[in-house]
Swiss-Prot record:
The active site is at 142 (acyl-thioester intermediate), 235 (proton acceptor), 237. Transfers a succinyl group from succinyl-CoA to L-homoserine, forming succinyl-L-homoserine. The gene is metAS. GO terms for cellular component: cytoplasm. This is Homoserine O-succinyltransferase. It catalyses: L-homoserine + succinyl-CoA = O-succinyl-L-homoserine + CoA. Belongs to the MetA family. The record marks 111 as: Important for acyl-CoA specificity. SUPFAM superfamilies: Class I glutamine amidotransferase-like.
Amino acid sequence: MPIRIPDQLPASDVLRTENIFVMSESRAASQEIRPLRVLILNLMPKKIETETQFLRLLSNSPLQVNVELLRIDNRPSKNTPTEHLDTFYRQFEMVKGKNFDGLIITGAPLGLVQFEDVIYWDHLKTIMEWAKHHVTSTLYVCWAAQAGLKLLYNLPKKTRKEKLSGVYHHKIHHQYHPLLRGFDDTFLAPHSRYADFSPEFLEEHTDLDILATSDVAGTYLATTKDKRNVFVTGHPEYDSHTLHNEYIRDLGEGMEPAIPINYYPNNNPDNPPCASWRSHGHLLFSNWLNYCVYQQTPYDLDHFSEDAFTKDD
């Protein structure tokens, strides 16, 4: 099934060249079906690149998804044209009266910044609190996962001494959990973060189901019992060259970044990297849309009620 996005969104041309079924708003308006409504709060600096990555994953589903893009505030962006933000992004005031089937909160390059020093921290807290009453399932990615754990469980910020960067092996737990349907016993996924997500720490201080872990990277995938809050500590949405671009950026800024682990052939940055996590990323998002969103959400979003959700699978 298609993904529905605004007719002139730049990502539409990219996705169509990849033979991804993108439906224009005008065509979708003539269909008499109940599409899912998903809101993406894009916290990454390069908005167009990030929105394209997430739309690519959302498109690989038999469900029609109507996507709205949300910006955290109206500050000018150094990496995204103002015209693009004004045309395709909503302010929170424009959506807070609505209900959504799903919310995705992206990562942000704030790994070494204390939460209270994040300029939009109070506004982010407002949005996350709003989501409890207006969104069926929220997917927190990388830095957003750490922020969500702070707000939902009051967990302190834990930071690694060295940045975790590369593609890591993970193993699954709770094999028959809906989010893991179709997963291999082990899989690869990229990480790019300072945050530390120890499985033992999460088990001690939360009631989360920890679904996938790495001996090196720690917790990768966890969810609340009712599947309304899903935490992904890595970047399954990343393109094959995203880690490379970050590595080159850090080199250019005079830093001494380690070469991303298990990423370049022969561990040589001169060799073009290959994405070894693409199928995992598509399956994860398909499962989230199907089992956490579609099969949980009310048909009539105007009758959204927290009481409708149970904590059992």
